[in-house]
Regions:
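Carbohydrate transferase catalytic cores enriched for Leloir-type hexosyltransferases
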Residues: 1-329
Length: 329
């Protein structure tokens, strides 16, 4: 998208570095500055917290969220320490800072005391060619891969890690299912993180309820999975943006999420909100299952709001950040 905005611009991609963090960081601090000296770009964009401190050109850094500071217990200790240090370096040395939400900007300004004018807010977009409403036949096809029969289901999409609050969702689903003639299944799609509390919550699920953890779903199955859920639940404790919420909205899902950090910026009035406790989530689930008209209304609103989030618009905001940084040379 940036290339289409500025056809005359030359975009140089750095080669993929090794998967080990130590090797990758060594390359970023030694190999990348050497590449910069050879290519002589106007701006370097580092898209994930860290930056080449020896680069002799303006560097723009993307900071995705501030939860490494505000909620370190939700991350592995080594990861939280590393990204806190990287964020401090970026705030101190970068020519420009890009964040995916106003909430992330405000948190970093509050925590590190930097000037908000240094930030450019660039909301993520969604690939509308992939994430869009699909017909019932496609929803049924995907349902057939989930091993839940013809049960309605509550869906979750994301990494199964503490920040996503999935154990509370499991307990909430069990409570919300009490008294239902036909309790919905719960399908937790995504890679496993390090959330041992989730294992304990799953172990306590009554035998008559159906829970599935299919891992990563094929990309082609995601629209059918999201659109086919009676409710797509995303009860996160905090996000820098919340891309699964936007992807679900684009597919016309009824989304239930929280008001933590950036999520209201994404959902607006097109999603349902709840607290982060199992009790609050359960109450919201019961209300949505009992109100098909509201679910339909939210689905319509979600599709409309999702259309306003595009990668072309995100690219335009990045261009602003690059121009501001280049002007500091």
């Amino acid at each position: 998208h940036y290339g289409r905005l500025v056809p005359a611009a030359e975009i140089v991609r750095a080669p993929a570095a090794a998967s080990r963090r130590s090797v990758r960081m060594a390359w970023e601090q030694i190999g990348l500055p050497a590449m910069v000296r050879s290519v002589r770009p106007d701006v370097v964009h580092s898209p994930h917290y860290t930056m080449p401190v020896l680069a002799r050109v303006p560097v723009v850094v993307t900071l995705h969220d501030a939860t490494f500071f505000t909620s370190p217990e939700l991350h592995l200790r080594s990861k939280a320490e590393f990204f806190r240090a990287a964020t401090r370096v970026a705030v101190r040395r970068a020519a420009g800072l890009v964040v995916p939400s106003q909430a992330t900007r405000d948190e970093i300004v509050r925590l590190l005391g930097t000037d908000s004018a240094r930030f450019t807010v660039a909301y993520h977009g969604v690939d509308h060619g992939r994430f869009h409403p699909v017909p019932p036949e496609e929803q049924a096809r995907v349902r057939g891969t989930l091993d839940i029969g013809d049960l309605p289901y509550i869906g979750f999409l994301g990494t199964l890690e503490p920040r996503k609050n999935v154990p509370a969702l499991v307990r909430a689903w069990v409570r919300a299912s009490e008294g239902m003639d036909r309790p919905p299944a719960l399908v937790l799609a995504g890679g496993r993180g390090w959330d041992t509390a989730l294992d304990a919550a799953i172990a306590e699920v009554p035998r008559h309820l159906t829970v599935r953890m299919p891992g990563y779903l094929p990309l082609d199955d995601l629209p059918g999975f999201l659109a086919g859920a009676t409710v797509l639940a995303y009860p996160s404790l905090g996000e820098g943006f919340g891309l699964p919420v936007l992807e679900a909205m684009a597919c016309g899902a009824t989304v239930l999420t929280t008001r933590e950090l950036s999520l209201p910026e994404v959902g607006g009035d097109a999603v349902a909100y709840c607290g982060t406790s199992a009790t609050a989530i359960a109450e919201a689930l019961r209300e949505l299952f009992a109100a098909p008209e509201r679910r339909e209304s939210l689905s319509v609103a979600a599709k409309e709001r999702a259309r306003t989030f595009t990668w072309a618009e995100a690219a335009r905001h990045h261009l602003v950040a690059y121009e501001k940084a280049a002007a500091r040379r």
